[in-house]
Curated annotation (Swiss-Prot):
This is Putative pyruvate, phosphate dikinase regulatory protein. ADP binds at residues 148-155. Pfam families: Kinase-PPPase. Its EC number is 2.7.11.32, 2.7.4.27. InterPro entries: Kinase-pyrophosphorylase (IPR005177), PPDK_reg (IPR026565). HAMAP family: PDRP. It catalyses: N(tele)-phospho-L-histidyl/L-threonyl-[pyruvate, phosphate dikinase] + ADP = N(tele)-phospho-L-histidyl/O-phospho-L-threonyl-[pyruvate, phosphate dikinase] + AMP + H(+); N(tele)-phospho-L-histidyl/O-phospho-L-threonyl-[pyruvate, phosphate dikinase] + phosphate + H(+) = N(tele)-phospho-L-histidyl/L-threonyl-[pyruvate, phosphate dikinase] + diphosphate. It comes from Bacillus cytotoxicus (strain DSM 22905 / CIP 110041 / 391-98 / NVH 391-98). Belongs to the pyruvate, phosphate/water dikinase regulatory protein family. PDRP subfamily.
Length: 270
């Protein structure tokens, strides 16, 4: 038996229709000859496909979300004696009836969702790779650069922005004994956000951190004078960069993230 030609017609890439057709044709002992026709936007293209399908005695399977395009293809194919199968239309109509919601009728939704998912994964991987100043090269690649002393929520904030806002975030810890990476002075100051914290608040946070690790809270790490020294160093660096500073002393991560996102959006508007 000759291979049956199937024209897969779509207003997007056509992956959904292609997969469904291959799954169905897999139930038969002959290889399908699938010819994809993607990104169909006008009835002229549909008319041409119908004509070719008629001459090849082919089947048309399609995923067109716009009702007028779907109806045109079904009507014109029937006039020409061409079999046309609507893969997605009846399901959209059924869901609309059950939910009493109006469909968006927007082509390529699945692909757009996939792209958003991969952007999120890419942002999360970026945050891990360039966490805690591990690789200064990330500073110049980042959408956002967080700067602060230890225990100012740089890491969880980086992950939150990556996971929820799909932003690539690098974070840089500051200590007096180590010069900040040169990249910190090369990146646009609009991308940088200094995370400021009250010395007493930081003192409490660090003591609790040491206790959770089974260490003495009298270590230099939690010493108030040491903390003030670190904050002084932080302020000198931030003043040199001249970037926005956010006081995170009494802010939840979500609140700080919203401030950053709003600042970024405002910058893009001007």
């Amino acid at each position: 038996m000759d291979n049956k030609i199937v024209y897969v017609v779509s207003d997007s890439v056509g992956e959904t229709a292609d997969l469904v057709v291959r799954a169905a044709m897999g139930q038969f002992p002959f290889a399908p000859d699938i010819r994809r026709v993607p990104y169909v936007e006008d009835t002229g293209t549909l008319k041409e496909v119908i004509s070719i399908a008629k001459s090849n005695r082919a089947l048309i399977c399609f995923t067109l979300v716009k009702p007028d395009m779907r109806q045109y293809l079904l009507t014109e194919a029937a006039k020409e004696g061409v079999e046309a199968y609507d893969i997605i239309g009846p399901l959209i109509d059924q869901i609309a009836e059950i939910t009493r919601q109006v469909p968006r009728y927007e082509p390529g939704i699945v692909r757009k969702l996939d792209e958003e998912y991969f952007k999120k994964i890419e942002a999360i991987e970026f945050a891990v790779k360039y966490d805690d100043g591990r690789d200064a090269r990330g500073i110049l690649k980042a959408d956002i650069v967080l700067i602060g002393v230890s225990r100012t929520s740089k890491t969880p904030l980086s992950q939150y922005l990556a996971h929820n806002k799909r932003l690539k975030v690098a974070n840089v810890p500051l200590v007096p004994e180590v010069d900040p990476p040169e990249e910190l002075y090369q990146v646009s100051k609009e991308k940088c956000f200094g995370l400021k914290i009250n010395p007493e608040k930081l003192n409490h946070i660090r003591k609790e951190r040491l206790k959770s690790l089974g260490l003495s809270d009298g270590a230099t790490y939690a010493n108030i004078n040491r903390i003030k020294e670190e904050i002084d160093h932080f302020e000198k660096v931030i003043n040199k960069i001249n970037c926005q500073v956010i006081d995170v002393s009494n802010k939840a991560i979500e609140e700080t993230a919203n401030i950053i996102v709003n600042a970024v959006q405002n910058q893009r508007m001007f």
